[in-house]
Structures are given as structure tokens and as C-alpha cells.
């Protein structure tokens, strides 16, 4: 039997004062986090988020990966950027005042932390990668999927202080294996959503097209900005599924960009070019990444073998001594969506890389133990889960694809 709705009644309903009225702008909607999921757009996005999460576990479990829970509180900085939330119990007492003065003066030492809960510096994790690597050496193929935190004071549409990361690690795998896994994973998640959330994707795509038309008609910049918030994404999703991803090295990418600039095919931000001109050794900016994916190849692009200067110490050094076995996947409509690498399994090279990047060798002694007591070639990647949901839904602001976004000042 199929149930049919004949009568619907709501209680305590006062439509005159409901703040999430039709046509409300996303910026205003974010002021009502507890109510915004009742709107059609946000409920579509959250159903897509659910499907992406389910597809993630299904993809890895079907391929024999083991799910590992990595710690939320950690002592190591995986990214080496230092933008971490510190965890301490010292601020509730008189010792806390002394601790804060020492912290501001840069004079904290081991004796200070002896009074703290963990007896040493502790932070909210920025990545589970280093921890999940320990299990790849025992369980072979593993992945972690959990919350991560960045104390990066960036109040933009691309950054969150709390977000979720998917980080698989494959034993006996090189960078090519890693790239194939990442491509298969992206295609799997998108295909799953296309199959199971077709109505949601089509609804969001139609809404985005209407907003794009309204932006085009707006007479001033303020009006265009008010109509923003969504991008028609259906064509980009179909491009991902259409065929193999384009592959190129970082050097080839730079050469292509320089050639197209010289030939007058593209012009990049003059202010950025003045500060940091396009050249070999420059970390690709978002405008470079999107140009390659959207204009040159019109499909996702896997860029490999980046200069070692702006990549992490754990990435395997190439024979040229200048580049590392790193990769980024650049997707049309969003730019970088996945970053990964083959890990450095040679102990002497790893220890030197830690020193070269002015990291504390003692902090990573346990990580070096993974090589010291036997290891295998392995690789992995990281994907910001909210970036994936953004890509599937077409939402332009990352704060609109997570139930309760955390960002500076929120």
C-alpha cells in the first residue's frame, strides 16, 4: 500500500514572523543557522551532503579499505603552517595568566607545559594523515573521514575554521596509483549523487541558472553580488564523468600558462602579477588552476611533481632534487579539489626534509619511527569534504554546505 497525504497541520506556526522567507539572500540566511535547512535550497544541499558521505564510505569499503578514527587532539602540525587551535587547561587559574604572558612573549618551554593537562603542547588536528599512515603500515589500505580545524583568519567564501577531511592511504602505491584512486573516487561520488539525488541536482542547477540571469540584468555591482551564491554545475559534473582526467606536470602547466599569456590568450590579475609574477617556482593561484581546467582542457586536470619549496616535508623527493611526488586535482568551476602525494619512505631523506623546513625533529620522531622500523612505498590524498559538496551542489560559499559553519567572528 502507498500512503497518501490527505491533511497536514502544523503547531505553533506563525508565518508572519518566519525569518527564512522565499527569496532571502544566502548572507541573511546564514544568520538563522538553526532554521535555514527548512528552505528548499538548503534541504537539497544537505541531502547531497548525506549522499556524498555515504558514497565515500561505500567506495572505500567496497575496495577493502579499513576505516580508522584518527585523534582530534594532537601534538603534531601535519601542514607545518602553524595555524592551529591550541588546547590548554591553564587559562582558568592564576597559572593561566602567567602562561598567556609567556605565550605572547614567545617564551613558552617544557617547564610551562608541565602544569597543563597533557604536560606538553596540544592542538586541534589540522589533518589525520600522519596518524592514518601508521595504520597503512599494518592494515595496508586505510582511510580516515573526520573533522579538522584551522585557525586561519580568512573570512572568505573558501575557508572554514572547522571542516571535514577524507584522507585515504594506500600501501605499496606510488603517485600514479594515488592519482587513479582519486579520479575513481571523484567519479564514484558524483555518479552516486547523479543517480540518487537527480531531483536535488536539477533543482539547484535551475535555481543557479535563474540567479545567473538575474545577475546579468542587475544594473550595478551591488545588485549582482546580491544575486550570487550559486553556479550552474550540471555541465561540470558531466565533464568529470565524460572521460579520463588530463595529466600534466607542474613544469608543463607553467610552460602552458606562460605561452598562453605570451600569445594573448589570457590575462591574469595584474596586481597579483606585479607582486608575484608567473614563473617556475610560483605556487599556482586559483585563477591559474581554473584557467587550465575550465578554458584549456575543459575537464579535471591532475598536476604532478611540484617544486619542493612549497610542499610538505613528507612528500617523496624526485631524483632531480628540485621537485616532489605531489599532485593536485584541478576541477572546472572550483579549482583545486584534491591534494596528495607519494610519501617519503627513505629515513635519511625524510629527516633532512624536516630540518630543511625548520620543523622540530623531536616532534616528528614517532613519524620517523615508521621508516626506522620498516616501511613500504605508500601514498595518499586529502579532500576537503565541503569542497566536494560545493562542487556537486554548485554553492559558491563553503559556509552553505555544512550544517553549522565555524569561521572567524562566528
Residue ranges and their predicted role:
Residues 1-410:
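Class II aminoacyl-tRNA synthetase catalytic cores and aaRS-like
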Amino acid at each position: 500500500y502507498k500512503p497518501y497525504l490527505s491533511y497536514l497541520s502544523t503547531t505553533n506556526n506563525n508565518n508572519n514572523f518566519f525569518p527564512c522567507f522565499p527569496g532571502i539572500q544566502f548572507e541573511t540566511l546564514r544568520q538563522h543557522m538553526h532554521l535555514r535547512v527548512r528552505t528548499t535550497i538548503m534541504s537539497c544541499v544537505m541531502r547531497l551532503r548525506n549522499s556524498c558521505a555515504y558514497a565515500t564510505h561505500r567506495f572505500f569499503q567496497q575496495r577493502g579499505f579499513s576505516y580508522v578514527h584518527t585523534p582530534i587532539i594532537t601534538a603534531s602540525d601535519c601542514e607545518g603552517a602553524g595555524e592551529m587551535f591550541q588546547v590548554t587547561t591553564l587559562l582558568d587559574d592564576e597559572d593561566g595568566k602567567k602562561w598567556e604572558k609567556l605565550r605572547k612573549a614567545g617564551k613558552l618551554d617544557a617547564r610551562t607545559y608541565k602544569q597543563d593537562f597533557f604536560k606538553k603542547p596540544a592542538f586541534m588536528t589540522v589533518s589525520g594523515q600522519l596518524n592514518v599512515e601508521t595504520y597503512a603500515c599494518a592494515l595496508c589500505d586505510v582511510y580516515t573521514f573526520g573533522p579538522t580545524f584551522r585557525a586561519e583568519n580568512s573570512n572568505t567564501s573558501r575557508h572554514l575554521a572547522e571542516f571535514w577531511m577524507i584522507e585515504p592511504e594506500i600501501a605499496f602505491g606510488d603517485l600514479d596509483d594515488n592519482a587513479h584512486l582519486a579520479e575513481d573516487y571523484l567519479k564514484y561520488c558524483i555518479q552516486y549523487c547523479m543517480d540518487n539525488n537527480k531531483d536535488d541536482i536539477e533543482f539547484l542547477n535551475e535555481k543557479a541558472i535563474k540567479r545567473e540571469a538575474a545577475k546579468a540584468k542587475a544594473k550595478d555591482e551591488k545588485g549582482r553580488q546580491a544575486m550570487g551564491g550559486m553556479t550552474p554545475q550540471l555541465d561540470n559534473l558531466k565533464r568529470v564523468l565524460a572521460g579520463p582526467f588530463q595529466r600534466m606536470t607542474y613544469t608543463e602547466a607553467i610552460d602552458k600558462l606562460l605561452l598562453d599569456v605570451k600569445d594573448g590568450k589570457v590575462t591574469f590579475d595584474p596586481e597579483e602579477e606585479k607582486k608575484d609574477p608567473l614563473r617556475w617556482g610560483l605556487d599556482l593561484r586559483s585563477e591559474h588552476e581554473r584557467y587550465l581546467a575550465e578554458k584549456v582542457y575543459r575537464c579535471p586536470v591532475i598536476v604532478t611533481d611540484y617544486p619542493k619549496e612549497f610542499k610538505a616535508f613528507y612528500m617523496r623527493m624526485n631524483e632531480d632534487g628540485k621537485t616532489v611526488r605531489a599532485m593536485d586535482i584541478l576541477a572546472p568551476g572550483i579549482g583545486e579539489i584534491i591534494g596528495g602525494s607519494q610519501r617519503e619512505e627513505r629515513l635519511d631523506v625524510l629527516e633532512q626534509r624536516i630540518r630543511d623546513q625548520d620543523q622540530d625533529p623531536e616532534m616528528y620522531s614517532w613519524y620517523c619511527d615508521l621508516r626506522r622500523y620498516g616501511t613500504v612505498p605508500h601514498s595518499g590524498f586529502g579532500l576537503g569534504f565541503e569542497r566536494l559538496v560545493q562542487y556537486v551542489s554548485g554553492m559558491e560559499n563553503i559556509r552553505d554546505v555544512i550544517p553549522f559553519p565555524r569561521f572567524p567572528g562566528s
